[in-house]
Every structure is written in C-alpha cells, then in structure tokens.
Amino acid sequence: MEKLVIVGAQWGDEGKGKIVDLLSKDYETAVRYQGGNNAGHTVIVEGKKYILHLVPTSILHKHTKGIIAQGMVIDLEVLSKEIKDLEVLDIENRLFISDRAHIILPYHKILDRLFEKKSNIGTTLKGIGPTYMMKYARKGIRMVDLKDEDIFFNRLEENLEFTKELCEKVYNERFELNKDEVAEDIFRLFKPIEKNIKNTFKIIQTSKSVIFEGAQGVMLDIDIGTYPYVTSSNSSTLGLSNGTGLHPKYFTDAKFVGVSKAYTTRVGAGPFPTELKDEIGDALRDFGHEYGSTTGRPRRCGWLDLVALKYACDTNGFDEIILTKLDVLDIFDEIKVCIAYENFEDFPSSLKDMENARPIYKTLKGWKATTKAARDKSKLPKEALDYIMFIEDYLNTKVSMLSTGPAREDYLYL
C-alpha cells in the first residue's frame, strides 16, 4: 500500500494545493484530516482556477475518491457550494464525509467574533476555534448526530442557551439566533449530502493508495506551533492519527513531505523573526502575489527562516522538502537566509522569546535570471542551485522538487 503525507512546513500558504494536485494523480484516495474552511488550496487546471476549502484537492482527478475525515470541522454552507462548483467533475459519488466530523454552526461564528475582539489572534472568523472548543468540551454536534433529531435538538438547545448567556452576560451583546431557523438551515444543507456520510476509517483502511492533505502548516499547529498564534487543530503530521482514526503504526511506511516557500510568509498576528517591513518585503509580496486565498489579507513577508524550517523537519519527520515560488527570488541581487537566532540555540517555545528572536543571516548571491516556468534542472542558474544545496545541507533533508510558477505544469524534479 502506498501512502503519501503532504504537510505545510511553515505558517501555511506554501502552495500545497498545487503540489498535492501534481502528486496525487496516481492515488486511489485523498484525505483531508484537520481544520476547516479557514484555509484554501488554490489549483489551476486547464486554465480554470479552483479554490478548495474543505474538499480534498486531489478530487480534481476524476478517478480519485475524496475523504473529509473525522478531525475536520465542517461548514455545511461552504461544503454545499464547493460540491456545486465541482459539479462538472461529478464528485458526488466520489466524496465521503466522516460521520464523526463536527459541524460549524452559526453560534460558533458569533463566539469567534467575540473572542477575537478580546484576543486579536488574527482568526479568520469562520467559527473554527469555537467548534473545536465545544468538541473538547463534549458539547459538539457531529454529522452522525443529524441522523437522530432528538440528539441534535437537545445539543442545539443546550448550546444556544450557553452562547446566549455568554453573549449577554459576559460580552453585553444581544443574541438573536432562533433554534428552529438554525435547525431548518442545517437540515436543508444536510439532506443532499446524507448519502455521503460514512465510516471513512474503513474506506481509508481498505484503499490501495492514499494521499493525506494537510492544511495550514506546522508553525500553526496547536501544540508545536507559535502558540497562541496558531490554529485550533494539529496542522502537522501529529494530527494524522486522531484526524483519521488510524493508529500510528499505519503511517510507519508512509512518505512524509513538507512543502515550503523559498522565502517565508505569514498571515495575521504572531511572531515572525525574519519579517521584512521594507521595500524588500513589499517586493516579495507584490511579485509573489501574497494575499490569502481565504481572507484576501496581505501576507507578511520575509527571508527564508531555516531555524523554523529545521524545527518543522525535526518535529514532523519529513523525508523530503518541496520548495515553491523559487521564481519570486529572481529579482534580487542578494538573498538572505536565517541560520540562527541571537541568544537562542533552539527554536523557542515561549511567545516572549519568539517575539524577541533576532535572526542571524547568511547572505547568498542572487541569480538575476528567470526561473519562472523552468521545467528542467539544467535550465536553472548556478546560483539558484547553490541556494537549494545550502537549504538541503542546513536541513539535512533533500529538496526533491521545485515549483516555478502558478500553472500546473510549472515544476521540476531535482
């Protein structure tokens, strides 16, 4: 059985969607196992752009089954729209949703907004965090619960009362959600996909080849990321077992691949040691079109942080790294990479230490030649190859592939 795990090695937005699309064409089954519609994978196929938030990217291959596994939280409105947008690909009979996956409800989004006003973490306000919060408080509503109206209405009523009290007594805000209206909307969206609700654990276990698609990135992982400026799930390889229901031994023969940009970006608040708030940062953003596919927010940009990337490799066991957006660096005479932080030997776990981390840079010669759409290693400038070799040596991990542009065909193997 062939198993491939693709995970973002930075703060998300590394270009995983295209990589997954490229590598998944021979796989029988594709699995999303954590997160929700707080991340978007963008893929361009035959000139048409697809932005997928919940449905696995690999389902764009017409022979591939797509699984939304138990570790995900699902906004039924968003899922319904994605299925409709992909109607031409006839995905309805190839998409399976875990009966254990939790559902995002309107009160989760209200709570998200209220929490964000207090904490300013930089959440997408999609209700993701509060859905996970209620999951772990044992107050969540799962897909399977929609098949039993008594369970659903009891949970819904309890959660609406809890949210109403929180809104009115703690945040001094009116709460106007109506139980019957919420239920009507949920069942309207649920009925068309009810046939797709399955025990997805069994489907994965019996598949001959499986690709696992991570969302966000290692540095946003709830446990090993830059806490508290993280997402609400394990967006690293740590989330595989609990996100799918598969035991850890299942993954012992899997290949783990991390995807990283040739520089670093981050959306929202949180520590970012190599951030550039100057014309170089602006150039990276403009030339790299660095705006979030889900939020449209401009991304913060900076030089490649090898300290953070090495930490991601070590904590996730990456067998290979795939480097994206190398072509964005074509415009620079010199390129810097962070090889250490002042006063810190290891990647800090303390927020205060991370905010005070000062990068120590190594300056490498730029290539000032186009690598855009390069599809052959022999066509790459020597300085670009030197840059890749420096990264490999520092990480002690092979860079196996480059993405050199947005089109599906813009890539090369090393």
From Swiss-Prot:
Binding-site residues for substrate, renumbered to this chain: 293-299
Signal peptide: none
Gene Ontology BP terms: 'de novo' AMP biosynthetic process; IMP metabolic process
UniProt: Mg(2+) binding residues: 13, 40
Record's keyword annotation contains Magnesium: yes
SUPFAM superfamilies documented for this protein: P-loop containing nucleoside triphosphate hydrolases
Pathway: Purine metabolism; AMP biosynthesis via de novo pathway; AMP from IMP: step 1/2
Cofactor: Mg(2+)
GO molecular function: adenylosuccinate synthase activity; GTP binding; magnesium ion binding
PANTHER family: ADENYLOSUCCINATE SYNTHETASE
UniProt-listed NCBIfam families: PRK01117.1, PRK13783.1, purA
Family statement: Belongs to the adenylosuccinate synthetase family.
Subunit structure, as described in the record: Homodimer.
Physiological role: Plays an important role in the de novo pathway of purine nucleotide biosynthesis. Catalyzes the first committed step in the biosynthesis of AMP from IMP.
UniProt protein name: Adenylosuccinate synthetase
Origin species: Hydrogenobaculum sp. (strain Y04AAS1)
Lineage: Bacteria, Pseudomonadati, Aquificota, Aquificia, Aquificales
